[in-house]
Amino acid sequence: MLFVLELFSHYVLHFERYFILSRQSTLLIQWSIVVLAGLYLLVHHPKINRQRTMFLAGVILRIVLLAGVSVELIHQVQSTNFTSAYLREDGKELLPLLHFLLYGYVLLTAFHYMLMPRDHGGKGKFYTFDLAVVSLPIVQMIFSFFSYWKEYPDGMEPIAFVFLFFIITLPIALNVVFFKLYWRTDKILLGLFYTLIIGLLVLLLAPYPNQISKDYGAVMPYTIYLAMAGFLMSYHLFQKSGKVYVRVNKWVTMAVMVFFVLLLNPIYNIGTAAFAVSKPANVHDSFNFVGEHISSEKAEQILKSFFPTDETLYLHDTNMDVHYFYSFESKGYKAEVDEVSQLIRNYEYLQKAHGKKLTNQEYKRKSIAFLERHGRVLHKDHIETKVSQEDGQTVVRIYLKNQLHKKDHADDGAVFYWEKETLMGFSEDPSIYQLDSLLHVHITEQDIHDKVEQMFTALNISKQPYQITDIESDSLLGSMVRVETKVGIVLEFEGESGCLHSLSLPMKKNISMANSRLQHQILSIFDARGSEKKKKSSQGDMVMYTDSSKTYEFVEAQGQLNVYVYSDTPDQSFPYTYRNGTLAYEKVASLYQDVIYKKRMRPIIVQRGDERHYAWLIIIQPFGSNRHDAYVVDGETQEVKSLYES
């Protein structure tokens, strides 16, 4: 039973995890189910006209559902430029509306049909209206096609018009066949109808071979129409089947009603019961930099400060929990902004270059001036600049110079792609900036100096020159500061906590895995707790130690003794049920100022240096915006912190 409840929890969370239904749509569906079920029980009273009441209920239900469609459209219009040309490029903007039609309109009207009397005379009107409503997304596809064709007349392949022909003719043909069968059953037409319905659903929904991807969002308008048409015909045939209908209709109707009420009532349903006992399994997602991520609005401001534009910047992948990097696009350019470091990468200008061709020296000066003009603080004594030609463009690469060892910098540094006087491409690299100017790096040069001095003392190594040779920054993978000494010792520090993450020593006579005294000297550099550390395992070229919070791994590889430190994940499974996650969301919602459009909860591990604890990540999308507000709620204390900077 517990397994079934856990399985059901994951099914319910699927709708949250992928932002399938908005909060407004979910409540509308839930309360409509309850009201229809209650009405079905009431109409059996002898003084109530069952046919008239259920007909009026059907009319009111469809008015309410169209109001729900309007709410979804209002949100989409407010949250993005809702144009046909844009929809043709990124059809995901219509997905919330399509999800509501599939899981709201089709589900609720089907439920209403199940509750209607067999001899009701208004079903034909409802059939016509419902098929017209679920055909609207297909009509939108057709208008979007012609809008895109008008804007990009050379971008259409001949095969696209063949697809357009089928998009237009198939629903028309199915509607004609449907209403012919509604008035008079014909076995040949019935076979043709179900062949088309089932065949098209299999074609649209069955997965293709691995090498071919399928966009289920793009085919959803047809999926909705086919599901509705298939249900209506099956229901119509069921009602016409005299003996079968009389024998099973009452019990089928009651079973369906009870199932949906138990499943979807908004007060206490099967999902609520499942959440009370089931816990997340295999929680591995960890989050750093809590309180330091930037919002999509801040990212857009940063991008526009570098590349001013009056055009709308579209934010892609708005269904993601956390972006890690924000991907924007306009007609003029596209670019990404890292959610933590606030650095720009993969900028690409999409229009023609202008101006005149400059000299290599002028391109160098323009590149450095561009960074300084936008507040970047270069480490001028430690950078080099290289100019090359690629595909007719002048490429300027600014990288951190390794003063101790020769290194190929072909893929390092900030890179500029110039064509004439136009910047056609650009990506930043934090390594070329002064350490104290990087907002996401919390270790100072003095901290690094102290740790290097501690290493020299602990290992009895004479002091020698060292330098920062690389700074990595990635919201998904974390940040790292790499330091190298003249003799090839490499230290890597975590950018957020400033802790030493790894140490690499060139193998020598006294530096090897066999030297147990050396192992303890190295552990002291990592500040391992002396009274608690113990050897966990030893095999061949690897030795592991642990203390109360960390694991230290010694590995010999390619002439180097490498030492890595890991913060131990708590041994126990995630200790909180999904009900605790719901309470965490309710606490966040009580403090939230805007109208909540969609929400999602996700179990995570919060990490900062040695500290690791379980928490809930609560994602909220406000109504009328594609912004995501993220909050971290401590699993034990229920303390709420915003993931984004204040």
Swiss-Prot record:
Keyword field: Cell membrane, Membrane, Transmembrane, Transmembrane helix
UniProt source species: Bacillus subtilis (strain 168)
Membrane topology classification: Multi-pass membrane protein
Gene: ylaA
Main localization category: membrane
Name of the featured protein: Uncharacterized protein YlaA
Cellular localization per UniProt: Cell membrane
Cellular component, GO annotation: plasma membrane
Bilayer-spanning residue ranges: 20-42, 55-77, 97-115, 127-149, 159-181, 188-206, 216-238, 251-273
